């Protein structure tokens, strides 16, 4: 078993991004990331704090706007439009989930697709499925970087993705297909799941069930990517994969924490820098 060290790869990418940001600044462009947080969800506050910290570390101009839980949908949409129109901001991120009185669909649709660093706008989803992506959801994008860094061969391989969310499962499956893997999407209603997972050369698990995947579910030598984050009764973090068991049969595996998580935030930064570069090139033409 070899560990896929997401923390180390994220640090390496951050150093490379800082160099790119410095070059953009020399050329007169300061990449900007605007983050909007509605309400006081503790997990969301941690995520936003981590994103802002990393943005500052690589030299981005970052803004975090914290809005009360009671903010109206209209007010939120107006704020997004201000960021859309401003050339100061190249990436816009609205932290999910949102309060029930605000339509997530309307909010995601309101963000300029070229500034949608989360990759959740329907236009960006459509471009991904058409094989011509502009912005890609950051968790699957980070996983693809891991595959590149660790020289994981995808072409012709059998890949199983457990989970069908728009955030991870669906875009992950599409990226694997674009890399010429043969892909199966499984989910909570899939029957005979073990029959599928035992055939997978690449197994990506994003179903939100604590240590559900055991050694008996995994093919010898498989590459296992664990997207899950679950806390046990003692508050300890675990993935959807039973790491202690599965590491004995996998050729490569991501730990939780320290695997996929660090890469997710780094890819948000990468897409912000890419958006700023694209804008600068447009302006110079």
UniProtKB/Swiss-Prot annotation:
Homodimer. One of its GO terms (cellular component) is cytosol. Its EC number is 1.5.1.5, 3.5.4.9. GO terms for biological process: L-histidine biosynthetic process; methionine biosynthetic process; purine nucleotide biosynthetic process; tetrahydrofolate interconversion. It catalyses: (6R)-5,10-methylene-5,6,7,8-tetrahydrofolate + NADP(+) = (6R)-5,10-methenyltetrahydrofolate + NADPH; (6R)-5,10-methenyltetrahydrofolate + H2O = (6R)-10-formyltetrahydrofolate + H(+). This is Bifunctional protein FolD. PROSITE patterns: THF_DHG_CYH_1, THF_DHG_CYH_2. InterPro entries: Aminoacid_DH-like_N_sf (IPR046346), NAD(P)-bd_dom_sf (IPR036291), THF_DH/CycHdrlase (IPR000672), THF_DH/CycHdrlase_cat_dom (IPR020630), THF_DH/CycHdrlase_CS (IPR020867), THF_DH/CycHdrlase_NAD-bd_dom (IPR020631). It comes from Lactococcus lactis subsp. cremoris (strain MG1363). NADP(+) binds at residues 163-165, 188. One of its GO terms (molecular function) is methylenetetrahydrofolate dehydrogenase (NADP+) activity. Keywords: Amino-acid biosynthesis, Histidine biosynthesis, Hydrolase, Methionine biosynthesis, Multifunctional enzyme, NADP, One-carbon metabolism, Oxidoreductase, Purine biosynthesis. Pathway: One-carbon metabolism; tetrahydrofolate interconversion. Belongs to the tetrahydrofolate dehydrogenase/cyclohydrolase family. Coiled coil: none annotated. Catalyzes the oxidation of 5,10-methylenetetrahydrofolate to 5,10-methenyltetrahydrofolate and then the hydrolysis of 5,10-methenyltetrahydrofolate to 10-formyltetrahydrofolate. Pfam families: THF_DHG_CYH, THF_DHG_CYH_C.
